[in-house]
């Protein structure tokens, strides 16, 4: 039974790595289409989402089957639960790639706003966060996963800065409005990519250490406030 479970875990590792490669490849395709205004590349990114969706379903079914047949515990259980969660997150990253590609098609046909901002740089940073979170998964590296968490605030700041500059450009040049709208959406999608990378990194930390990072932050805040795990008293009316 244990040998069969380890064989299933090995197969799940291979499957999630294959899905990761498909998602990263299509994300690069979509972001390149935005940068180059390549409508053919954008259309290809949209078309290549279907195999990603199919594989996500297959991986989830394999995970549920392993849980039912082998009833794993401890590290094996955490691994399978983590794969279920990351599998779903990767599917959402794939959907974002499609959303970006669709906006790239509309942007290519719209007046191009002239904005002093490196959107490509922001996209590369978010894409690198996704890649680094998946590398942390492959290596079971909690430290590398924590480094991904630290990068999220920078993407949030860049998104806010780009949004402000786009809004200013739209006010000064109403003729750019359609292009501004598409870029605003693309910027928001890039910010969500970073959020998904953060989610994957948190799941890796849970898999390796059994610790849910967002709960550990809440616990630290509670301890600093003197709650020490106890339910705080209700205020008197």
Tell what function each PLM region has.
Residues 1-237:
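Cytosolic, long alpha-helical scaffolding segments
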């Amino acid at each position: 039974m244990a040998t069969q479970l380890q064989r299933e875990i090995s197969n799940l590792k291979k499957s999630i790595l294959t899905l990761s490669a498909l998602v990263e490849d299509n994300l690069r395709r979509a972001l390149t289409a935005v940068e180059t205004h390549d409508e053919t590349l954008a259309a290809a990114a949209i078309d290549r989402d279907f195999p990603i969706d199919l594989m996500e379903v297959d991986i989830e079914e394999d995970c549920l089957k392993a849980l039912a047949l082998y009833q794993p515990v401890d590290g094996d259980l955490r691994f399978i639960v983590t794969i279920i969660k990351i599998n779903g997150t990767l599917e959402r990253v794939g959907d974002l790639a499609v959303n970006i590609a669709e906006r790239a098609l509309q942007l290519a046909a719209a007046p191009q706003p002239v904005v002093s901002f490196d959107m490509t740089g922001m996209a590369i940073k978010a894409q690198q966060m996704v890649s680094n979170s998946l590398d942390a998964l492959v290596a079971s590296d909690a430290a590398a996963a924590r480094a991904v968490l630290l990068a999220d605030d920078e993407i949030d700041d860049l998104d806010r800065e780009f949004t402000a500059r786009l809004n200013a450009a739209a006010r000064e040049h109403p003729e750019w409005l359609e292009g501004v709208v598409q870029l605003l959406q693309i910027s928001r999608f890039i910010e969500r990519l970073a959020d998904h990378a953060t989610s994957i990194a948190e799941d890796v930390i849970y898999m390796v250490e059994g610790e849910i990072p967002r709960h550990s932050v809440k616990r630290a805040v509670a301890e600093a406030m003197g709650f020490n795990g106890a339910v705080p008293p209700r205020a008197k009316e």
